[in-house]
Regions:
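Pre-Walker A adenine-sensing motif
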Residues: 113-128
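Glycine-rich, often acidic-flanked micro-motifs
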Residues: 2-48, 62-63, 124-138, 152-211
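Short linear motifs in intrinsically disordered
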Residues: 8-18, 58, 68-74, 114-117
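Conserved glycine(s) of the Walker
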Residues: 141-143
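Detector for glycine-centered tight turns/loop "hinges" at secondary-structure junctions
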Residues: 86-87, 117, 169-170
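Post-Walker A alpha-helix
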Residues: 146-147
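Active-site phosphate-binding and catalytic loops of NTP-dependent enzymes
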Residues: 53-59
Length: 211
């Protein structure tokens, strides 16, 4: 049986080689995702924020729930990035600098659009002492900021963006991924948790500055 390795075990050139080629297989429980991209900020974001996530020891050795690509469009004038799932482009392309943010947003869309075995809530969820607290809120209300702050106060992150509930048991299916912070929230968390890891910033997005 193959033992998974961590993404951090890959050098930057090895990471790019996989992203440029058949794709990087990344285990983001409960999902397996294959990512392809030649955009530098995608490799940078994955190396920074997914370093402790598992990858199969050999390329192409596992099943992937989602095959996603981040492709550059318009090479010279205001270059853009497009998100694709299985070769289908569900969104309008965004600025190339937003490519890693688009990966995160696109992955959220993959889950909400295709994983109907759970009740999916737009809510952060954390655990402490075997109990989960669910934080439902509209975008821009500070949900992710509160979620990140609680993480540094002894709470365990189960999900920042989507709460997946088992319909029969009512239990939460953990799907921990990097917390998405915007604008002043980035500095708030940096001040409260100086040792936290902040990924590449995307400026001038529709949501402002996103990390």
């Amino acid at each position: 049986m193959n033992t998974p390795h961590l993404l951090s075990s890959l050098s930057r050139s090895q990471l790019q080689d996989r992203l440029f080629g058949d794709g990087l297989d990344l285990l983001i429980p409960p999902f397996a995702v294959r990512v392809q991209s030649r955009i530098d900020v995608v490799a940078e974001g994955l190396a920074c924020l997914y370093a402790d996530y598992q990858i199969p020891p050999f390329r192409g050795t596992g099943f992937s729930d989602f095959h996603v690509s981040l492709l550059s469009c318009r090479r010279w004038f205001r270059p853009l990035c497009a998100f694709q799932l299985d070769g289908v482009q569900p969104f309008t392309p965004l600025a190339l600098s937003e490519a890693f943010a688009l990966f995160e947003w696109g992955l959220n869309w993959c889950v909400t659009s295709h994983c109907h075995q759970w009740v999916t809530l737009h809510a952060a969820v954390l655990e402490r002492d075997g109990r989960a607290v669910i934080l439902p809120a509209p975008p821009g209300s500070g949900k992710s900021t509160l979620c990140a702050a609680l993480m540094f106060r002894g709470w365990r992150l189960l999900s920042d963006e989507l709460t997946l509930l088992e319909p029969e048991s009512g239990l939460v299916m953990p799907c921990p991924r990097p917390v998405s912070l915007k604008n002043i929230s980035i500095d708030v968390i940096r001040e409260r948790a100086p040792d936290c890891t902040i990924g590449p910033l995307a400026h001038d997005t529709q949501k402002g500055t996103v990390a």
